[in-house]
């Protein structure tokens, strides 16, 4: 059953201005100041935009085939103390990127082998080439239905295709985008993650406003 969304009471001209600010990556608070609307109104409008994006991205979630880069990453949390894999207070996420194509990203409970393998099997066609780094959870791919290529970051020499630069670049873009919000509640993190996925998959930037306007139907 499709969930019905309430029609916005904002004038179409105001909605269009807020859409432009959202696509530009401006925070809701700043957008409120620039458009002259109430701050809470802008916050709610941006929240609804992200909910629409999550719904649409779920509908077009790709089933990937060919050369696929996979990687987990960790977002947020305090900067002090342990960093990287398993860092306390951080949100673990997992991503799959088809080279020259789309990315799929999601929050995960943990980065254990069976967790990651389950997602890979759900989203990647058997016999695809799967590139990973040397994290031990990916060892299960060595005896799977996929062709596993492991990347060793400690080696200075990198073969032309032996890398996961694409998915790492996506993580960098996503973290840079989220950093401007000065902390995202975990309960809403998936909305922002899917926003980053949408921005990547529907680039270049000029297409984002067109796509989102069609989804919102202002």
Label every PLM stretch briefly:
Residues 1-218:
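Residue-level recognition of single "structural anchor" positions
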């Amino acid at each position: 059953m499709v969930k019905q969304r309430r029609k916005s009471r904002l004038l179409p001209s105001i909605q269009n201005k807020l859409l432009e600010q959202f696509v530009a990556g401006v925070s809701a608070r700043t957008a409120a100041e620039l458009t002259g609307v109430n701050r809470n109104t802008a916050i709610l409008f941006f929240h609804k935009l992200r909910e629409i994006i999550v719904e649409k991205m779920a509908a077009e979630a790709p089933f990937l085939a060919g050369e696929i880069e996979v990687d987990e990453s960790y977002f947020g949390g305090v900067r002090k103390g342990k960093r990287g894999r398993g860092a306390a207070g951080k949100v673990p996420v997992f991503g799959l990127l088809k080279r020259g194509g789309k990315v799929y990203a999601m929050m995960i409970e943990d980065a254990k082998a069976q967790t990651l393998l389950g997602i890979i099997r759900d989203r990647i066609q058997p016999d695809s080439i799967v590139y990973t780094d040397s994290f031990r959870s990916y060892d299960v791919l060595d005896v799977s239905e996929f062709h596993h290529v492991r990347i060793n970051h400690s080696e200075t020499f990198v073969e032309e295709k032996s890398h996961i630069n694409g998915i790492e670049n996506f993580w960098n873009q996503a973290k840079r985008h989220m950093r401007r919000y000065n902390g995202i509640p975990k309960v809403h993190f998936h909305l922002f993650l899917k926003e980053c996925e949408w921005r990547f998959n529907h680039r270049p930037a000029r297409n984002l406003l067109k796509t989102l306007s069609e989804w919102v139907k202002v």
